[in-house]
């Protein structure tokens, strides 16, 4: 099944998720060769790009064979995120993604990744500025919520759609769950019902059968 994200048309709706330490260039090329419609890069700190961190420059490299490719940025400063994306607009990236789902303590302590789900107003500001700063499609990846007292994936998805985001990706666990327990695909369905933009399901997709079942459910 084909999928369109903004003006980027994908061959199919099978997407390689962004995974730090996993989705490097050789892995992405391999996944494209095996039929993935879109591959996502390892998350990159917008601040690290700003400060010209050497390791970060390596993470930004792309091979034409892997396109279309999505560059995932993370950060909590709306201006820095928007300015960095704008500075990379002429680069070999087809989509800009913003990470609002990373559960790692170091990231969360900095108010980045899934910590942003506790601050919908800041989410709105980041996404609004990012969408205005670039012509390429913007997507956002987030979780079911921060914890059981903050299940707000639907609210975040609606904010994203209103800000002009082209698609959202939803992981069916809260930040407090990390990767334990079972991913709640029902929340993905709720988000799908709440917005008109494409919704990408994430979590517990280990086999082709899982992927098929996720789409059906």
Residue ranges and their predicted role:
Residues 1-217:
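Flavin-dependent oxidoreductase catalytic cores
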């Amino acid at each position: 099944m084909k999928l369109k994200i903004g003006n980027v048309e994908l061959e199919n709706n099978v997407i390689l998720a962004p995974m730090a330490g996993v989705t490097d260039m050789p892995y992405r090329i391999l996944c494209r060769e095996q039929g993935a419609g879109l591959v996502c890069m390892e998350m990159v700190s917008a601040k690290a790009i700003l400060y010209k961190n050497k390791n970060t420059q390596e993470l930004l490299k792309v091979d034409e064979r892997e396109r279309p490719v999505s560059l995932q940025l993370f950060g909590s400063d709306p201006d820095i995120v928007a300015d960095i994306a704008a500075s990379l607009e002429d680069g070999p990236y087809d989509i800009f993604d913003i990470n609002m789902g990373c559960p790692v303590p170091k990231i969360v302590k900095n108010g980045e990744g899934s910590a942003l789900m506790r601050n919908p107003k800041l989410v709105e500001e980041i996404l609004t500025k990012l969408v205005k700063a670039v012509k390429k499609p913007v997507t956002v990846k987030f979780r079911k919520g921060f914890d059981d007292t903050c299940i707000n994936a639907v609210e975040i998805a609606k904010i994203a759609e209103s800000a002009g985001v082209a698609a959202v990706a939803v992981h069916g666990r809260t930040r407090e769950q990390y990767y334990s327990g079972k991913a709640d695909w029902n929340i993905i369905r709720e988000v799908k019902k709440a917005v008109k933009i494409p919704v990408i399901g994430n979590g517990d997709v280990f086999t082709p059968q899982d992927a098929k079942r996720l789409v059906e459910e």
